[in-house]
Curated annotation (Swiss-Prot):
Keyword terms, alphabetized: Carbohydrate metabolism, Cytoplasm, Hydrolase, Magnesium, Metal-binding
Chief place where the protein resides: cytoplasm
Catalytic activity field: beta-D-fructose 1,6-bisphosphate + H2O = beta-D-fructose 6-phosphate + phosphate
Other comment: In plants there are two FBPase isozymes: one in the cytosol and the other in the chloroplast.
Lineage: Eukaryota, Viridiplantae, Streptophyta, Embryophyta, Tracheophyta
Native source organism of the sequence: Beta vulgaris (Sugar beet)
Full protein name: Fructose-1,6-bisphosphatase, cytosolic
Residue numbers binding Mg(2+) 3: D121, D124, E283
Pfam annotation, one family: FBPase_C
Length: 341
């Protein structure tokens, strides 16, 4: 009997243990971040359970309300938003919350305040619920500058100021991927234990990938560099093999695949939507943060994505993120266009 192998299998690194280990590396830590993360994890577990039994519980119909993006809200959207708002406030470690579902930011009452601001999309890709496609929760965490004088400026910061970011994908398995600024790690939910277990330690995106991910239905409205890049993916002139197109339409699922297999995920601006569709604070920033931490890049068509300074909490931006070399290629096309302008 291989006792060493058995020991490896039984020495499970849970997400709580992992975050506590990270905390021990920082002498100034008082455990606030660990408590906050445990509440985010609780929210993810609740939503995972709700997504898994959505059909049985009749949660997947439209709720009859419209969110501020003008999208019909699904019942699961509403439920997920409420769960995360309550979980984050009850942690006692948050100050300002920005949700994709709420028009205004939520300022936590002073007696329950902590030093963190959390920006999140409680259920990204919700239009895919009915057809069983993977959906997910995306979150980013900032530190408040002055706890006694918290303002919207505390969340209207560039993404490079985030202290942590992550997403939880609800699919064939429930996977939580996060970074606290020192690499990216992935955890898979074990339903028998009720715990997230470290299954993807220190994720590194391949330097170059074989996949591109974009909604080609918008191609007629694209700008020059995006059109040229996709043409290059399909019909390479250097004798290399064409890239494969993979597009699910759920950002969490598309980015998760890109992170693990390499390649590029694109949601460019176009004639119809010059700023693209993705929201800066709780979609572009967290995913860009993760990509950079995994050794990739994120670019808006004009600048590094994490250098953007949002003016409003629901601002949108184009984004190109993924393998370092693939993003370099599209950056070169934008630079050439600017030079010729």
């Amino acid at each position: 009997m291989d006792h060493a192998a058995d020991a490896t299998r039984t020495d499970l690194m849970t997400i709580t243990r992992f975050v506590l280990n990270e905390q021990s590396k920082r002498p100034e830590s008082r455990g606030d971040f660990t408590i906050l993360m445990s509440h985010i994890v609780l929210g993810c577990k609740f939503v995972c359970s709700a997504v898994n039994k959505a059909g049985l519980a009749k949660l997947i119909g439209l709720a009859g309300e419209t969110n501020i993006q003008g999208e019909e809200q699904k019942k699961l959207d509403v439920l997920s938003n409420e769960v995360f708002i309550k979980a984050l406030i009850s942690s006692g470690r948050t100050c300002i919350l920005v949700s994709e579902e709420d028009e205004e930011a939520t300022f936590v009452e002073p007696s329950l305040r902590g030093k963190y601001c959390v920006v999140f999309d409680p259920l990204d890709g919700c239009s895919n619920i009915d057809c069983g496609v993977s959906i997910g929760t995306i979150f980013g965490i900032y530190m408040v500058k002055d706890l006694n004088n918290a303002t919207l400026d505390d969340v209207l910061q560039p993404g490079k100021n985030m202290v942590a970011a992550g997403y939880c994908m609800y699919g064939s398995s429930c996977t939580l991927v996060m970074s606290t600024g020192s690499g990216v790690n992935g955890f898979t939910h074990d339903p028998s234990l009720g715990e997230f277990i470290l299954t993807h330690p220190d994720i590194k995106i391949p330097k170059k990938g074989k996949i591109y991910s974009v909604n080609e239905g918008n191609a007629k409205n694209w700008d020059g560099p995006t059109t040229k890049y996709v043409e290059k993916c399909k019909f390479p002139k250097d004798g290399s093999s064409p890239k494969s197109l993979r597009y699910i339409g759920s950002m969490v699922a598309d980015v998760h695949r890109t992170l693990l297999y390499g390649g590029i995920f694109m949601y460019p601006g176009d004639k119809k939507s010059p700023n693209g569709k993705l929201r800066v604070l709780y979609e572009v920033f967290p995913m860009s943060f993760l990509m950079e931490q995994a050794g990739g890049q994120a670019f808006t068509g004009e600048q590094r994505a994490l250098d953007l300074v949002p003016k409003n909490i629901h601002d949108r931006s184009p984004v190109f993120l993924g393998s370092y070399d693939d993003v370099e290629d599209i950056k070169a096309l934008y630079a050439a266009e600017q030079k010729n302008a």
